[in-house]
Structure formats: C-alpha cells, structure tokens
C-alpha cells in the first residue's frame, strides 16, 4: 500500500516512517511512504504557500496554486489513490473508517493543512475531508501519520499476527481488557490467577467481562442497545444457562465495584469536609 503526503514539513513524515512498525513495514515492501512538498510549486524566493484571508481575520490561509499543483503531481504518481485532506471540518476518524480504508485496496494521498486552513477551492481536488477529533493541532502532518499508522496495522505482515489488529480496542467494539506480563508479583500487585490457569475458556470469559466492564464505565456510547440491556436491564427469559450465568456474575461484579467506588467517594468527602 502506498501513502503519499502533501505536507509543508515533510521531515515530520519521514521521521515517523523511519521507526518501529512503520519502518519495518516499509523495509519489507509492505508500505511505501513518500512526500510532495507544495513549496516546490511556488515561484517566489520565499517559497510562499499562504496568504491573508479575504474579508479579514486572524491567521493565514493556504494558497490554492501550490497546493493544487502538488495534488496534481501526487495524482500523476498515484492516479487511483484516494485524496484525503486532513482538517478539523472533516468526518471524525473511527476504527470502522480505518478498517474501510485498510480493506479498500486503494493507495492514499494525504493533504496536510496548516495555519487557518485551506482555501476552500482546494477541496475541489479532494475526495474527502478527515479529522482525528474535536481539537485543533498546529498542522495536518501528525493526524495524517496517525491515519497511516492505523491503516498499516491491518496490512498482512505488518504486525506479527493480524489478530493483534483485529483484537485491539474499538476493532471489537469494546475497550480492551487489562494486559499483564512477568513478573507475577510486582510491588504486591499480582497477575490475576485466571490468566495463569491455562484454561482458555475461563481466560476468554474473564477478558470479555473486563472489556464489557471497562466499556460500560468509560465509553458506554460504544455499547449496542442489546449489550446495555444485558448489563443493566432485564435479562431475556430465553437464554442459555451458561450465558445467563455469565451475565449474572458480571452484573454482580459491576454492582460490587460501583458500591466500592461510592464508599471510597464518601470517605474522601468526609476527609475533605
């Protein structure tokens, strides 16, 4: 898969692609990373890519001439690539979008914004706008790197096991369960016994419980209506005994943890009062 960036600061892209998983993926020929600098399409001594906005206002706006010329050059190299402009006004990146990109079979051209953003006419040469969240960064290079990293994890051979990507948080629709490694005991904190049992059925059950509990506590918006009902509502009458027992145990654990947290908050209030 090929990733071509249109950044004002290509060294940020080159630096990110020269380390860790991305570097190994590139060395194996699984991904190709390159840049086209819009400054190379300017015609003044200062290589100017921005100008003041019509109508007034703070900041500078990226000029259409060098940006569009760079996009044209990128499309010459990757004629079938999807052109994505990184900007706050785009649709927000989610794991489902990452997987859509990864399985599309397409290459990607990332156009990186800066300053107050793009001249609106630049978007005529863009397939879609993409944001990584509801906050503003200095430039679009880091968001574009994040998207490349997320996509690359789904390319066969990039990770040790493709399951590593498929089992990550958000790929399953749930937050990830806690992970542990050696030593068994660290400063009085022990690895849960179930993870050392070798019983994979029990381990999988424990992991699912932890994922559901974490998601309910931290990101309930990720749960489906059915999952929320199983965790907090009435259990269906027709249900396998093993499944019913699983959710009854899980609900009891959730209730106990909520009671424990409430008790700790009361003690803290009393101490501060």
How would you label these PLM feature ranges?
Residues 142, 154-194:
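Internal, active-site/partner-interface "lid" segment
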Residues 1-74, 201-217, 221-224:
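N-terminal nucleotide/polyanion-binding subdomain common to many enzyme families
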Residues 4-6, 34-36, 82-84, 108-109, ...:
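Hydrophobic/aromatic beta-strand patches that form the interior of the parallel beta-sheet core
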Residues 183-273:
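SAM-dependent methyltransferases
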Residues 38-41, 114-118:
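Short glycine-enriched loops at secondary-structure junctions
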Residues 118, 122-168:
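Structured adenosyl-cofactor binding patch, chiefly the S-adenosyl-L-methionine
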Residues 20-24, 99-103, 127:
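Short, solvent-exposed amphipathic alpha-helical segments in soluble enzyme
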Residues 63-112, 119, 156:
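S-adenosyl-L-methionine/SAH cofactor-binding core of RNA-modifying enzymes
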